[in-house]
């Protein structure tokens, strides 16, 4: 069993404060929740297990036991997970407050050790100091944390996480903040705690302490669509879909890193708990992570042969053509915005190809096809620009005064004409590479303007931000019939 979980189970009994704070799902009545194949550490009980998604942020960081309480590290209620979560600039004083909280909730002194030793020895054959019987006394105080960056804000969730080498499929990475504190001072705190333990347990305590306090921090991970609930991902192709989340809230102070100090004043802590309540939010899916997911799915179904075809219909409306017909049964095409982008991009590219190459039918095999598969995913800017550059080179542009030009004299639809006028101020006869980049980005930005999107969804906002946005009715997306430009 996880050390942190064991420790909470036993220390929960020592006083009223601990009974309120150390309440974990894994040590209460089990309520089943959907299991997934995502492996990682539950932020609530610190055990490595199969995770389910959090109802507060939709990321995978809860185990099936702890999910019954719906706690999130972004809550504004002073539960243990929130008090262990620090944000952005963490000072030495903040870490000192964290250590004080650990020492308050998980004290090790002669009275506590005797209490646990006596209760354990009441059972037969338990006169030896075997690790598994005293796991709750072997949790050292460390500055080990799991950290994640969410649109410029870095969150550190402190705890005692066993088996650091296990598979981690979450966006959280191990970070050691001992260098921001004082190694010798932390050593002294733990040696004092260790001195109350029987000699047989001291070595195990020391090994655990040094293994969790001297490790090298991992490189921070990038948050992707894989880290969010499958229920959300499955509904992304519905333009009117909103994510429903719940947050545990209370009247907390604005000092994010100072919440852990509440345990030093028991009456103040319980007064704050009296204001606890749940808030519900309906959140837009509009963000770069989810937009890229949709564009990547659409990219898998691209039929590049359309750019050399003579079809009179738009790219998504071609039927009974072996080379150009897309399968409209895929859910990605349920989002009319993706269809609109696909139609306009391919209408523009076909005009470019027809203006510069002598290709008469979509059955022909052209080199340009291999680069067209990446024209939708504008979120991967470097890869996208390489693809557009290669497409431009395939047009065999003419060079004048060190600038290459491609002809543009083939008909396009009215949507593309309007975007041409908006982006390059006219309906041109010739285009440079830069013009083509601007036009193609304008076609995509009309519906998904990633320049003004946050990277992760608003489900990763703090409660304060959600409240401010909710006041202005900005937590929901634009009306499904209006583009980003409008």
UniProtKB/Swiss-Prot annotation:
Main localisation: host cell
Cellular location(s): Host cytoplasm, Host cytoskeleton
Superkingdom of source: Viruses
Region (Important for cytoskeleton localization): 82-176
GO CC terms in record: host cell cytoplasm; host cytoskeleton
GO MF entries: metal ion binding; RNA binding
Presence of keyword RNA-binding: yes
Pfam family for this entry, one: Rota_NS53
Record note on modification: The C-terminal region is phosphorylated by host CKII/CSNK2A1. Phosphorylation of the DSGXS motif is essential for host NF-kappa-B inhibition.
Record motif IKBKB-like degron (ILD) motif, residues: 479-483
Annotated S-S bridges: none
Keywords: Host cytoplasm, Host cytoskeleton, Host-virus interaction, Inhibition of host innate immune response by virus, Inhibition of host IRF3 by virus, Inhibition of host IRF7 by virus, Inhibition of host NF-kappa-B by virus, Inhibition of host RLR pathway by virus, Interferon antiviral system evasion, Metal-binding, Phosphoprotein, RNA-binding, Viral immunoevasion
InterPro entries: Rotavirus_NSP1
Region (Zinc-binding domain): 42-79
One of the GO BP terms on file: symbiont-mediated suppression of host NF-kappaB cascade
Region (Interaction with host IRF3): 317-486
Region (RNA-binding): 1-81
Similarity field: Belongs to the rotavirus NSP1 family.
Domain comment, as recorded: The integrity of the zinc-binding domain in NSP1 is important for degradation of host IRF3.
Function statement: Plays a role in the inhibition of host innate immunity by inducing the degradation of key host factors required to activate interferon production such as IRF3, IRF5 or IRF7. Associates with components of cullin RING ligases (CRLs) including CUL1 or CUL3, which are essential multisubunit ubiquitination complexes, to modulate their activities. Recognizes the host NF-kappa-B regulator BTRC through the presence of a DSGXS motif in the C-terminal substrate recognition domain.
Subunit record text: Interacts (via C-terminus) with host IRF3; this interaction leads to IRF3 degradation. Interacts with host IRF7; this interaction leads to IRF7 degradation. Interacts with host CUL1 and CUL3. Interacts with host BTRC.
Name of the molecule in the record: Non-structural protein 1
């Amino acid at each position: 069993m996880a050390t942190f979980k064991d420790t909470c189970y036993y220390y929960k009994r020592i006083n009223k404060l601990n009974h309120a704070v150390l309440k974990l799902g894994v040590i209460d009545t089990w309520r089943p929740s959907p299991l997934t194949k995502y492996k990682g550490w539950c932020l609530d009980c610190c055990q490595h297990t199969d995770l389910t998604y959090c109802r507060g942020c939709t990321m995978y960081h809860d185990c099936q036991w702890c999910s019954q309480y719906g706690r999130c590290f972004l809550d504004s209620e002073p539960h243990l997970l929130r008090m262990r979560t620090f944000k952005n600039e963490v000072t030495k004083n903040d870490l000192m407050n964290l250590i004080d909280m650990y020492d308050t909730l998980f004290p090790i002194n002669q009275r506590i050790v005797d209490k646990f030793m006596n209760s354990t020895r009441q059972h037969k054959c338990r006169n030896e100091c075997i690790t598994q019987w005293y796991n709750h006394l072997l949790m050292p105080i460390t500055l080990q944390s799991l950290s994640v960056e969410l649109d410029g804000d870095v969150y550190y969730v402190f705890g005692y996480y066993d088996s650091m080498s296990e598979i981690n499929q979450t966006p959280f990475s191990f970070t050691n903040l001992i260098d921001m504190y004082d190694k010798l001072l932390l050593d002294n705190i733990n040696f004092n705690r260790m001195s109350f333990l029987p000699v047989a347990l001291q070595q195990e305590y020391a090994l655990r302490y040094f293994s969790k306090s001297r490790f090298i921090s991992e490189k921070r991970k990038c948050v992707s669509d894989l880290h969010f609930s499958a229920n959300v991902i499955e509904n992304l192709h519905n333009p009117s879909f909103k994510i429903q989340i719940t947050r545990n809230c209370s009247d907390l102070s604005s000092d994010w890193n100072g919440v852990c100090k509440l345990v030093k004043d028991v009456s103040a802590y319980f007064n704050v708990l009296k204001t606890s309540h749940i808030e519900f939010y309906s959140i837009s899916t509009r963000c770069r992570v989810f937009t890229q997911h949709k564009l990547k799915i659409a990219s898998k179904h691209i039929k590049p042969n359309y750019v050399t075809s003579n079809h009179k219909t738009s790219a998504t409306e071609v039927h009974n053509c072996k080379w150009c017909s897309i399968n409209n049964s895929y859910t990605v095409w349920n989002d009319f915005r993706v269809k609109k982008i696909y139609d306009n991009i391919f209408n523009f590219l076909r005009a470019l190809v027809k203006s510069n190459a002598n290709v008469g039918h979509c059955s022909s095999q052209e080199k340009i096809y291999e680069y067209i598969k990446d024209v939708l995913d504008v979120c991967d800017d470097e890869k996208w620009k390489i693809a557009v550059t290669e497409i431009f080179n395939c047009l065999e542009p003419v060079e004048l005064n060190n600038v290459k030009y491609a002809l543009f004299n083939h008909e396009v639809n009215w949507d593309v004409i309007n975007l041409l006028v908006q982006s390059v101020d006219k309906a041109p006869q010739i285009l440079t590479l830069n013009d083509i980049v601007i036009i193609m980005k304008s076609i995509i930005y009309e519906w998904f303007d990633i320049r003004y999107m946050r990277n992760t969804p608003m489900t990763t906002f703090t409660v304060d931000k959600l409240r401010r946005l909710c006041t202005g009715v900005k937590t929901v997306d634009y009306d499904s019939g209006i583009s980003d430009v409008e």
